[in-house]
Amino acid sequence: ATPSPPTLYGLCSCEQPNTDGSLAYGCLAMDYIPQITSVSWKKDNEPITTGLKTYPSVLNKKGTYTQSSQLTITESEVGSSKIYCEVRRGESVWIKEIPDCKGDKVHPTVILTQSSSEEITSRRFATVLCSIIDFHPESITVSWLKDGQHMESGFVTSPTCGVNGTFSATSRLTVPAREWFTNKVYTCQVSHQGVTQSRNITGSQVPCSCNDPVIKLLPPSIEQVLLEATVTLTCVVSNAPYGVNVSWTQEQKSLKSEIAVQPGEDADSVISTVNISTQAWLSGAEFYCVVNHQDLPTPLRASIHKEEVKDLREPSVSILLSPAEDVSAQRFLSLTCLVRGFFPREIFVKWTVNDKSVNPGNYKNTEVMAENDNSSYFIYSLLSIAAEEWASGASYSCVVGHEAIPLKIINRTVNKSSDSSDHIWIEDNEEESAIDNASTFIILFFLSIFYRAAVTLVKVK
């Protein structure tokens, strides 16, 4: 048979690039005789040695041969280079340029959007989204500028996503609210196949009430300290930016918050609590609430500890019943518990009936007030009860807790059978003088003047 050269065809997959960005090129040699020696590939003038698959030659019915070879290569590897298929037989060489599998160039549409002023103020940061839509080929470069200067951080660009033969991507810029409201210009710059597009957006000129976070630490309740093995410390952070992190430490040791960060009463506040042992609190150890956020140059810290009290004063407890005519004539009567002469001011007062806790809605405690010499404090509590309950012989106790009390708790109990013709019961410390007893009696006497009005208020409530 007479030798004949191969006819070469360059092939390109009609499918768009795979999700990994790879392309498939084909080289088909037909109608040649005798068989060819080799099929190879080049990118410009550089040999390609990977991604190749050459199939065995096939003898056709008319006595000639056909052979094919496939090249798989990524779009980024091809770039702007040209791909060639080279066929050899002895000293003869045939070369075929393969069509561009990347398709036509399509430059992207670039759109900038921003979060609303209300969202920026509440979250304490602005979000600018640069949407890069419908481009081909896949390779792009995205950068951000602030007032014309390149930014090195504060933005994240997503991987490209291919749909229907084109690609899309997004780049998200985050700007602290304090900086956003200074009228700076931010630019999203997109480069694609030698063409650069820029889109600008200007921060708002509206002033922002973006004050620094403020930390307020709350100690445990005195009732917790006196009655429980663990106590709760509370950290309230106002003016808190969105995504703020609150943690606790004791000296250099991190503490685990028992309750995660949660919204406070205000939209821009968060609350974090931690449980510690009562013994640790009473020891005077220092506990820190640490507030951290990307907008803060350094974390904010505030500390709390139990202050040492040297001049402890134990309270005296006195109880007054409504006047006798009220007991007989009214459906409701009142008991008043006066607690005085104590220091420091932290104290709790509550009531029980027959050793069961009374609903706090049935009694009213006043604020703790300083006595005349300002060296001690007093408080009183007014309990409203039904006359028939009192007549049944129920026992009512005023329960007082204070750190100066040896057993931490004082119970003062009265009932219908208590022996007191003037309806006043007084329990005093042994150190109390006759003058103290007299002052207590006088205070209770004046309180009794207002009992009818006080009981009425409690009933209305």
Curated annotation (Swiss-Prot):
Entry membrane topology: Single-pass membrane protein
Annotated stretches, region: CH4: 309-418
Residues with glycosylation annotation: N164, N200, N245, N275, N374, N411, N415, N437
InterPro entries per UniProt: Ig-like_dom (IPR007110), Ig-like_dom_sf (IPR036179), Ig-like_fold (IPR013783), Ig/MHC_CS (IPR003006), Ig_C1-set (IPR003597), Immune_Resp_Modulators (IPR050380)
Region described as CH3: 206-308
PROSITE patterns reported for this sequence: IG_LIKE, IG_MHC
Region listing for CH1, in residue ranges: 1-99
Subcellular location: Cell membrane
Ranges for region CH2: 100-205
Entry keywords, A to Z: Cell membrane, Glycoprotein, Immunoglobulin domain, Membrane, Transmembrane, Transmembrane helix
Domain of life according to the entry: Eukaryota
Main location: membrane
Annotated GO CC locations: plasma membrane
Transmembrane segments: 438-458
Protein's name according to its UniProt entry: Ig heavy chain C region, membrane-bound form
Native organism: Heterodontus francisci
